[in-house]
Structures are given as structure tokens and as C-alpha cells.
């Protein structure tokens, strides 16, 4: 019966109070009930203190922290080196802050010093002019004849293709450079005699001429090569008469018949047909 007494005493107190005080008391009681429901281990959906609706678990690390009066660390908090740097900026205007660029020149110099402590600081830095001189001296940047180098690359590609096809049993005809002809002893030597394949039975003999001047291999590249196909002019072939359908009548004679009208012309043709029909004795009669 104790709770009844308390409830009666509460009601007596509320009668003496004003309306505003009664509303405040009711709100406080509702808040107490909500807090009891939050911590009784149940799984409920209600509007939490952050103003969002969602399922809330009372058990967990975050809730334990809240019950102890601690707060979770928010995301994006500076820690470690960044926190120390920010602490060193305290009391300094943001306009006077050091740049946050990683590869700043000061950092690079300190990094070089750490790597090479015995080296002088000026020896590691090379100017752009010295680098240009180095690249110009190197053999790879020497000026070359691009036309000839491209021609040789094409030749190398052709020889590679020829070897690839010849290994597979296909006949290949390749054009060799003059330098290669002169370098190969088998091709430069002329046989002492040759037998002809013809049925005449004549024998041709070739004799070495010591007085003949042989070209060295260096001059072989200067020999005139055959001209390129796009530079050679094709011989002008004779203009052919266009073939057409032969005309069965003279168009000039038709044009000259300006005195006869079309009606007269058709009348003459009709009379000719009638005359041919009567002479042949045909059974068909044409009515004019």
C-alpha cells in the first residue's frame, strides 16, 4: 500500500501547483521512463540524442564509453607527426606557415646530406647546361642520315621475313645490298669456266683480267641504286579508241531531213508495209 500513499501525496501536491509546473513534472517523468528503457538491455527503435531514427544496441564499446562519461574520437583527428606540426603552429598566423609540400627544396637537400655525408653540397647539383652538353656528347644523340638509316631498317626487316619464310620451305627472292655482295667471297669470285645449258654445245670461258680495277667495299655503297618507283615516269601509252555500239544509220542524214514532218514520215512507212504485205500474199489485212 506504500505506492498508493505516494501516488495520493503526489496528486495532492499537483493540485496545489500551477499548470506550468504540472507540465514540467510530467515531462520529467517521461524522460525518466525513456532512460530506464534505454538501459534495460532491450533492442528498441527510437529517436536518439543526435536526432536520427535507427536501431540502437545498448551493449557495445561505444555505449560503455558513454556510460562512463567518455566520448568517441571523431574521424579526421590529427595524430602523430601532423599533430606535432599543428602544435608548433600555435600562435603563428596561417599566412606565415611553412609550405606543406613534401618535395620542397629544403627537404631534398637534407635528404641528400643524409645519403652522402662526405660529398660536397655543390657536387650533387648539376645545371641544365651541363646536362645538355653531356647529352650532345653521347653517341646516341649524334646526327645521322635519317634517310639511309630508315632504308637499312627496311632491308633488315625484309631479310628477317625472308629467313622466316625460307625455314618453312617457301621460295623467297630478296635484294641484297652491294656491301653484302662484295663482302661475301662466294659471290665476288667468278668461276673459271661455265658450261652452257643450251643444246648448241658451245663452251664459254671467263678469264680473270688483272688490269681491271675492283671497287672497295666502302665505294660499293656509293654505287647508283635503282630509282624509286614513285620517281620514275611511266612511258605514255597510245590513246585507245573507245569501243562502243556501231550506229546503223547516219545521224547526219536524219538531221538533214528537215523538210518532212513526222506525220508524213509515218505515212510513208505505213504505205511501205502495206505494199510488202500485198506482194507476199499474206492473210492479214491492215486497216488504215
Swiss-Prot record:
Looking up InterPro entries in the UniProt record yields:
FYTTD1
List where this protein forms a coiled coil.
none
Kindly list the places in or outside the cell where this protein is found, as annotated in its UniProt entry. Answer: Nucleus, Nucleoplasm; Nucleus speckle
| Main localization (coarse) | nucleus
Q: Which Gene Ontology terms cover its molecular function?
A: mRNA binding
* Positions of short motif UAP56-binding motif: 11-29
From the UniProt entry, list the residue stretches annotated as the region Disordered. 183-202
Extract the Pfam families matched here.
FYTT
- Family in the record: Belongs to the UIF family.
State the function annotated in the UniProt record.
Answer: Required for mRNA export from the nucleus to the cytoplasm. Acts as an adapter that uses the ddx39b/uap56-nfx1 pathway to ensure efficient mRNA export and delivering to the nuclear pore.
Q: Can you name this protein?
A: UAP56-interacting factor
